[in-house]
Amino acid sequence: MRAWRGETRWWWLAKRRAGFALGLAATLATGAAVVPVATAEGTGGGSRRGVAQEGTAPLEQVRVATRHYRNVDSAIDAGYVQFLGCVHEPLAGSMGIHFVNGTLAGDTTIDPVKPEALIYEVEPNGQLSLVGVEYIVFQQAWDAVHDQPPSLFDQPFMLVPSPNRYGIPAFYELHAWAWKVNPTGPFKDWNPKVLCLGTEGHRP
């Protein structure tokens, strides 16, 4: 696994983030083909003690689909790029560090096995640990072809208006904490168990 800390790593990530931003802007400017939203019923049972809530089949579906990305190098190779730093909200918790796939984020498809963002937490040893995913679709593109806001796993997406802390157009989003328990709920935005400690330089 690539070392996370170090000047060379930061320079490399800065270049990747710049490329991601340009690619996402181009996608939004040109538009993308519209694909109907996927259904999102759970496909299998079970969960892992200490990993996610027991008996939550959708989370198991997410784990199966994202197991390969527990190694962040695999996520990077698949087109996921770090977007901003460790997102933290006092008293509420954190969202961790998001790696976003610009191609997936720029379309209007919501696929439970192809999340637009992967969420990582920095461990004490400096390595990144996968803790969850986020599904993202831009409001303008979605509303142009749908009468209702998106939903997945019987959960409604939250609308994040613009302007926002991320500096991007208004979007709908849903978190799924498949790899780390969220005591406030598996689909809540903020996870008090996720920390931004020791991640100076990551916070937006």
Outline where the language-model segments fall.
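Primary mode marks residue(s) on the alpha4-beta5-alpha5 output face of response regulator receiver
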Residues: E41-P204
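N-terminal secretory signal peptides that target proteins for export/translocation
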Residues: M1-K15
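Sec-dependent signal peptide cleavage junction
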Residues: V34-G42
